[in-house]
Amino acid sequence: MMYYIWLHLQFVRKHERALQAEHRIQIMMTQIQPHFLFNTLSAIRALIGKDQKAASHTVGLFSAYLRQNLESLNQAEVIPLSKEIEHTKIYAEIEMIRFPNIRVEYDIRDEECCIPALTIQPLVENAIRHGVRSRKEGIVRVAAYREGNEHLIVIEDNGTGFTELPAKSEDGTHIGIENVRERLEQMCNGTMTIDSKPDEGTRVILRITAGKEVNR
């Protein structure tokens, strides 16, 4: 009897792990925007006829971006901030090739914390797509520093801003932001706040208490 109970418990645990993995993959997939994939391929195609060296460089960046996204699908634990920054830089460089009017700046003074994969990159993507891309000179800044017993990560832009985050958007932007918030809370006991002003820009602040990462 005890053996059958043990077998049943093993089955339940395995089933729960499978459901958790499926849920995690579903969340991650919402962070990978198909429009970016198609637009990047179109940009590479256009570059091939004009600048083969730039086209080759962009292909390399795009390959690295896809590889890291696929790795993120299997990432059940938090990752070092430096790894997420690296992924964000690859994404941002591709976008800066496509849109010469934007630039992404970094001020990383604290890399001692760990965060969920695909946390900063989707926020930078949102800042570019819905904030600075239409600006004559669009700027996104990513900063990380320590303040007391908290790790702070700040993503801010000089974009169009907004008065209220929409309940739902056609491209899944709001869903993606809420997924970042949810994973930050569950995996790091962290918080995310958004401050935005129309025609001035948006500021997103991630706060993680030092040593409070759950899955490490």
Regions found by a protein language model. Name each.
Residues 1-32, 36-175, 179-193:
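Two-component histidine phosphotransfer core
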